[in-house]
Amino acid sequence: MPGDQLTEETIQRVFLNATSAKIEEFFSKWNFSNANSTKFGMSEAERNLLGDEISAKIDNDDLASILLETVRLISRERQGLESLLNENLCDTILKLAGITPVVGYPRSVHALMEAQKCLVNTMFHSAKMRERFYMNLVNGDQIQRFLSEFEDSRRENSNIQWIREMNPTQAAEVWYFYHRIAFIATAMDKGFQRHWADQSTTVSNILCAAEVCLQKASDDVANLDLLRANEAMKTFFNVFCHFHGDVPGLDEKNTHLACRILRDVICSGIPNDDVIQSAIHALSVPPLPMDLSVLLSDPNFPIVPLPETISEEERVHPRDYYVNMTLTEAILAALDKQLIKAVDLLNSVPFNQVSPEGNTLVDLSGPYFQALARLCVESKYARRYCRIRVLPPLVADEVKKRPEEHDSLRGRIVRVMMLPSTTKEVASEFLFIICKRSVSRMIKYVGFGHSAGHLANFGLLGQINQPKHASDSEDSETEDYNAVKDNVNPVTGAMYPPDHGSAMDGMSDAQKEFEAMKLVDAMNKLMDQGLVKPGTIGDDGKVREVSHVLELLKDAPEPDTMDSDSD
């Protein structure tokens, strides 16, 4: 570790009867030497002593910034952090960060910023700091207020003096760190999430930073603006992602506001994939209603109320006006861009190995499928558009390869369905929705092998052999596909390979019997180990274990009596 080791002897020497100037001089050098350190090699006793000494001095105006920086650096190391932090130190950091409202605090912008950065680290790594933060709901209310109070017009007229007195550069950075703190606070405690989800001011306060980006010309949007907007939408996701049904904070007014801001961000063309991703994630949260009047309306064709004299048969449902697919296309394009990166990473390693980075990208694409699926459920126009974009009518050339081998959005989605992840489920559900929940169409496009898990989970295996509806093929097949579809393997979704002869050609009957018995023995071994169990499709359409192998024969056809030797 660079610089002086913070042993008990060193700590006592620095603080014992030392002037503020001497303490500042020592820790200025120590902080500089350890600016890039992540390990500090301190014992529990050394951390306890340092925490007590810093706690006693940190409220000194001359030392606050430098000692906060020291705590921030040491808090990079999760191990042993609880020994450093005591209740008084935690409360002082909250006070210096302006979060616990106390008259006369914060005292300086520099100390405020250091306290914010310190709080980001300690909130993330320390249960003790989180406990001190969450025990007072005023802390959360204060942060939420700050999420919108630093917008230029509000800051200039704020009734908080220290906010009014900041210059724009300082205010921009302080505002960003309050969003960082809000993101961590909303990620760590469900009770805190519920508190914010129940408030009518939450949506407007959180998304204020995103709206500021939209109000600026693209050339005027600074990188810090984008970082702040990104944190804001991640916080929105944290607050609402665990709830279902009606949430007080998402009333009609706030739903309209959230959908408008998120739509505009997604469609804005902002050259920042993280911001677009966070907006799509926020749009996907279950309790946020899909407000089609915002998400799919065409601003060039406003809805005109129809006269009351028009009959019900002549009336056009308002949803029939919501045919603007700009948002739908933007989400599809962002999804495809994400999956191109993910599939490239997955294919860059051997099939039996894992690409952690590729799997992470796949996991992050789950909300894209969720948002699209919800749009498609609410709007037949969105569903049709997605079906045309993702599952265009099949042609003969497309079934020469397996679905996952295609360099297309469909191929990449099927590749995702091959992974053992939760994204596999939402990707399958999205495809099933745009297949109009048709089992036969789903199998045709992705193969039974890829769709079996989804069909089994939803009890749909019993529909596999049902007759097709005319609509299953009328808009999903071409003439050249019809010419080859009888040669398509329904399991793989691709054509059978050319016949290269049977593997048993040239074998004697004794050899064939020997190979058959080897297969039987191998299957018996797997069954004895519990790795394989005989199963059948139950009345609910799901796979169930059979109690006896004879169950597998109950629906077998009777033997042809014409070949019987009996009279």
From Swiss-Prot:
Transmembrane parts of this sequence: none
Main location group: cytoplasm
GO MF, any single term: G-protein alpha-subunit binding
One Pfam family hit: Ric8
Subcellular location: Cytoplasm, Cell cortex
Alphabetic keyword roster: Chaperone, Cytoplasm, Developmental protein, Guanine-nucleotide releasing factor
GO BP terms, alphabetized: G protein-coupled receptor signaling pathway; protein localization to cell cortex; regulation of establishment of cell polarity; regulation of feeding behavior
GO CC term, one of those recorded: cell cortex
InterPro entries: Chaperone_Ric-8_A/B, Gua_nucleotide_exch_fac_Ric8
Family as reported in the entry's similarity comment: Belongs to the synembryn family.
Protein's recorded name: Chaperone ric-8
Gene name of the encoded protein: ric-8
